[in-house]
């Protein structure tokens, strides 16, 4: 086996567009240009979907919802992210777009207003030609890694995922870096769950300056022909990081 046989991928979780970290995103594009990935994963909560935020709608928070429009969110995401991004990836790159719980908000909204069915869905509005689209809670396997948005919100969420799924997984959802490994006593096989940092604004309006464990960053994955892998979470501190010996 040579280095050329190893597949490399990049994953971004919890972008929450338009409430994303633009500087981090620009640096991710630079990394893409440098390593030319074989696959790319948008890991869910790619769109914030704040125009259909059921928490604010159910509270009757008209001030918080003022000016939020789903059409504008789609148009801006396409022009500011997908148009630029699709031209940055190599033609051979496998592209995966996972839905997260924020994308699920839209389905919950359509449940209440079913007349929107067939018009408002992500697959009808986001430029996803050439992308594999996965619903919330679906997993996709590459090598021996299962990619998933994330499920639990407890303090030790990576441990919880390892206990329930018993697979090697990469998740997001909690906006922080966490790793847990579970080893079975039967044959010594290990399963690790990596919770990735987020690509969103670290202090959105609803956080109201509340302390958190959130960190910005993304993931880089190397997968060998037998499915074995190495996972490298990349943490961005004050909009900068070093990856593969290069300062971004």
Q: Where are the regions that the model predicts?
A:
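Active-site metal-binding loops of divalent metal-dependent hydrolases
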Residues: 13-16, 44-47, 101-103, 150-152, ...
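N-terminal active-site segment of His-dependent metallophosphoesterases
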Residues: 1-82, 244-248
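Conserved beta-sheet core of the metallophosphoesterase superfamily
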Residues: 144-240
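Charge-rich, low-complexity terminal tails
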Residues: 98-102, 108-110, 234-248
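A short acidic (Asp/Glu
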Residues: 21-22, 50-54, 106-111, 158-159, ...
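Flexible, charged surface loops at secondary-structure boundaries
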Residues: 3-4, 33-36, 89-91, 127, ...
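Active-site neighborhood of divalent metal-dependent phosphoester bond hydrolases
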Residues: 52-136
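Hydrophobic/aromatic residues located in beta-strands of well-ordered beta-sheets
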Residues: 40, 95-97, 193
């Amino acid at each position: 086996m040579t280095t050329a046989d190893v597949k490399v991928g990049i994953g971004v979780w919890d972008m929450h567009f338009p409430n994303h970290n633009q500087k981090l995103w620009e640096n991710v594009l630079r990394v893409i240009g440098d390593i030319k990935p074989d696959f790319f994963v948008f890991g869910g909560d790619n769109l914030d979907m704040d125009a259909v935020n059921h928490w604010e709608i159910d509270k009757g928070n008209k001030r918080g919802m003022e000016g939020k429009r789903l059409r504008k969110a789609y148009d801006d995401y396409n022009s500011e992210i997908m148009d630029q991004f699709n031209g940055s990836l190599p033609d051979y790159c496998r592209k995966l777009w996972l839905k997260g719980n924020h994308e699920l908000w839209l389905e919950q909204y359509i449940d209440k207003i079913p007349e929107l069915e067939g018009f408002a869905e992500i697959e009808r509005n986001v430029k996803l030609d050439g992308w594999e689209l996965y619903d919330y809670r679906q997993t996709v396997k590459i090598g021996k890694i299962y990619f998933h948005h994330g499920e639990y919100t407890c303090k030790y969420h990576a441990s919880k995922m390892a206990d329930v799924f018993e697979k090697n997984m990469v998740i997001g959802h909690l906006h922080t870096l966490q790793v847990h490994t579970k080893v079975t006593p039967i044959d010594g096989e290990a399963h690790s769950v990596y919770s990735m940092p987020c690509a969103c604004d670290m202090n959105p309006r609803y956080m109201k300056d509340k302390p958190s464990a959130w960190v910005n960053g993304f993931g880089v994955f190397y997968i060998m022909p037998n499915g074995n892998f190495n996972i490298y979470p990349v943490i961005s501190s004050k909009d900068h990081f070093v990856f593969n010996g290069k300062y971004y």
